Amino acid sequence: MRIALAGNPNSGKTTMYNALTGKNEKVGNWAGVTVEKKEHPIRNIYCKNGEEFVAVDLPGAYSMSPFTAEESVTSEYINNEKPDAIINIVDATNLSRSLFFTTQLLELGIPVVVALNKSDVNKKKGNYYKRFLAFGKARMPCC
């Protein structure tokens, strides 16, 4: 089972990928650190049927209609390789920037989990993120 990690640049996708896989891929607090997709089995998941779960770290994107080479990698992977599920990593400190991309992902018919990252920082900004939690079919506060 392939699980794509998708979201805006600098939302925490690679940090999540490293936590799931045990890898140590480069992270930074600026856009453009991840420029190609990376795949690795998720550690500590055991299935009776032997199925392997693989995390796919995708470059940041603001839209499924690409404007940059990095967005093209993300859009082409999701549209052509059809992951089994998508974890949409959303920066809780800037929710409005993520809504368009999240909406596009939900319209694809692929199961989506919205993972709010940096929610500890957002608590200082008030409760705006509670409105986002009601958005979509699946939601999961994270990190």
Pin down the residues of each PLM region:
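Conserved C-terminal guanine-recognition region of P-loop GTPase G domains, centered on the G4
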Residues: R43-C47, V73-P141
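Conserved protein kinase catalytic core
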Residues: E25, S63-M64, R97, K123
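Conserved G1/Walker A P-loop phosphate-binding module
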Residues: M1-S63, E81, A85
